[in-house]
């Protein structure tokens, strides 16, 4: 799937997004993977307005691996420069593997120490 704007308030302003089904071996833990890539003109910002979504996401970014908790309100992410993210929409069964206190993740984004995952994804995304 490509260009699926579900969860984004203004999909026409969204950078290219690839949405891929989870492979069978991880489908009990991941609903799908999402990969946006952007290249914003210097000095410009692309604000991505997001709807609340009651699920956790694991996201690998160029500088970190993060775990986003379920959201209870609209939010946004400002994109600048060139970048990418490889994200996974997690099923509830995956969350206890990543945190001991899922409730504390509500409306939060926390960094995770997963250097091997970060290295593998960064290598795949940057060649």
Segments and roles (model prediction):
Residues 1-127:
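Alpha-helical bundle regulatory/interaction domains
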């Amino acid at each position: 799937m490509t260009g699926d704007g579900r969860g984004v308030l203004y999909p026409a302003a969204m950078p290219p997004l690839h949405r891929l089904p989870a492979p069978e071996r991880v489908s009990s833990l991941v609903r799908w993977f999402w990969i946006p890539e952007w290249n914003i003109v210097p000095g410009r910002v692309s604000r991505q307005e997001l709807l609340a979504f009651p699920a956790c996401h694991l996201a690998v970014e160029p500088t970190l691996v993060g775990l986003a908790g379920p959201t209870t309100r609209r939010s946004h992410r400002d994109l600048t420069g060139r970048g990418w993210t490889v994200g996974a929409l997690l099923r509830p069964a995956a969350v206890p593997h990543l945190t001991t206190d899922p409730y504390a993740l509500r409306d939060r984004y926390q960094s995770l120490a997963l250097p091997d995952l970060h290295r593998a994804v960064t290598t795949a995304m940057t060649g």
